[in-house]
């Protein structure tokens, strides 16, 4: 059965030169048509060495169906490959952040975005057409500061569709239970949107390697709730950056070991977290 993301997957992993000009022209024209001079929503892609994945992500964003005025921006986070050329070829407004980390890249995007509502986008991920509007049904509610969603992986020769179904079902059940007391731990950058006015009053952490999005969500709690959208039509599809070369079973066992150590946390709230040394960015 054909999936909504199959055509984006057809160029995913291909070098810049391997993508047909006709496809690149289509993406470029679609992106240009989406840009509003007075956006309510900013959709900001961060990319580090994503030459072989960025165009597929932008193709999906170019086909968003939304009733809101939007802008789509890019951040080139000190890439050493041809990521910048992809932005240029597709005519996407972008900014360069030489300080390398997701935190610095997210901060650069926030500083240059115009919209009241800010959507974080990862360059190795595909987004369904209704993603923005469905997320906005939550984000525009009173007393909400930010919203996150679930996500899926696309099947490949090493990850079967049935195996992914089981893996995601168990993961989603755990995240659902966890979100009642610790919603900030359920937030992932690829599926994160927030009120930009609130975010500019706090700080996106640039001193940690992972978890800057969850940390931002925690900082936004005084302004409103962290809420979640449970809708299959708003479920992005991504690659295996969070799993790496592991099999699903290996990843599952690793997650069980990690989450099992602090399982009691799902029963109480927390407003402050201590940093672990291995997650701190070393300053030269």
Protein language model features and the residues they cover:
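Glycine-rich, basic loop-to-helix element that forms the pyrophosphate-binding segment
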Residues: 97-113
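N-proximal low-complexity "stem/linker" segments adjacent to membrane-targeting elements
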Residues: 1-60
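Short, flexible, basic/aromatic active-site loop/helix in glycosyltransferases
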Residues: 149-155, 163-185
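A conserved acidic beta->alpha catalytic loop
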Residues: 60, 76-84, 125
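Acidic donor-binding loop at a coil-to-helix junction in glycosyltransferase catalytic cores
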Residues: 209-216
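Short aromatic/hydrophobic "clamp" motif used to bind/position activated sugar donors
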Residues: 118
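Short, acidic, metal-binding catalytic loop of nucleotide-sugar glycosyltransferases
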Residues: 59-69
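Conserved donor NDP-sugar-binding/catalytic core segment of glycosyltransferases
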Residues: 130-161
